Amino acid sequence: MAKKQEIRPKNFSDFVGQNKLKKLLKVMISSAQVQNRPLDHILFYGNPGTGKTSLASIISNSLNSRIKYAQGNLLDKKTDILTLFASVEENDIIFVDEIHAINKNIEELLYSILEDFVVDIVIGVESNSKIMRLNLKPFTFIGATTQINRISKPLRDRFGLIGQISNYQVEDIEKIIKNNSKKLNIQIDEKATNLIALYSQNIPRLAINLLKRTKDFCIYEECQIIDYKLVNKTLKQLGIYENGLNESQVKYLRSLSETFYKKAVSLDLIVGFLSLQKETIISEIEPLLISNNLIVKTPRGRKITQKGISYLERI
């Protein structure tokens, strides 16, 4: 079986965009190396697919440190925390993705771990119990979250840097597509590159996934280069519309325009009509529609905008 292609950037030069944050990280890394001490703990926040895990990996490469990955939603019990840090070596990096999903009942364990590199364990029960303190070797903790508002202040205060992953520009996404087309050994022309970028919601991961799916069609049709026509065909097959909307989002728009006659309508009515969970609509469907000004939230409910009406007429 062929080895899976690794397209994640390995260094800061490979990582497109986020120039201010990259500069700050390079300064921190250089300072830590000169002082021969671990890098301060870092918290990255931003939208999914924008490079938080990649930056953690690049930091690990820059420091020549071992990195251990974990998911916040899997850190549910005290033993999960203890297991995560039990084998930590000096200058290791512990990366926890979606750190906001850590069980809040065990979050306090992290405070002393991050601040003093110690963990207190209760041995025994009730009157016979005693606290045993374990000293950990100095390490760097990197957290990533898509929901910074769910990170408690005591936990946030343990990070030496809180870095926001800012929105990408179309030019950044186009460069990411070109860089990854080389890694994927596929040629792509300028118009095709621009079209993928415009349909990617300015999110690197989505752009790369669209490039991969277009490559699949290119191989299937035995073409030599990805062009505008092939990208357009791929997008239609995937059910992806202008600005990166999917079929569920377009159906939502059509319901506001046609079923509810362009009037403001309550979320409960929309939920009933689309047969979707309320949380799915709020977190998965509406954000892109709102950011593109295709719908607005009013005191009376959701309403399609004139831009949203024009969008439906255009697609």
UniProtKB/Swiss-Prot annotation:
It is found in: Cytoplasm. One of its GO terms (biological process) is DNA recombination. Mg(2+) binds at residue 53. One of its GO terms (cellular component) is cytoplasm. GO terms for molecular function: ATP binding; ATP hydrolysis activity; four-way junction DNA binding; four-way junction helicase activity. SUPFAM superfamilies: P-loop containing nucleoside triphosphate hydrolases, Winged helix' DNA-binding domain. InterPro entries: AAA+_ATPase, AAA_lid_4, DNA_helicase_Holl-junc_RuvB, P-loop_NTPase, RuvB-like_N, RuvB_C, WH-like_DNA-bd_sf, WH_DNA-bd_sf. The keyword DNA-binding applies. The RuvA-RuvB-RuvC complex processes Holliday junction (HJ) DNA during genetic recombination and DNA repair, while the RuvA-RuvB complex plays an important role in the rescue of blocked DNA replication forks via replication fork reversal (RFR). RuvA specifically binds to HJ cruciform DNA, conferring on it an open structure. The RuvB hexamer acts as an ATP-dependent pump, pulling dsDNA into and through the RuvAB complex. RuvB forms 2 homohexamers on either side of HJ DNA bound by 1 or 2 RuvA tetramers; 4 subunits per hexamer contact DNA at a time. This is Holliday junction branch migration complex subunit RuvB. It comes from Mycoplasmopsis pulmonis (strain UAB CTIP). The gene is ruvB.
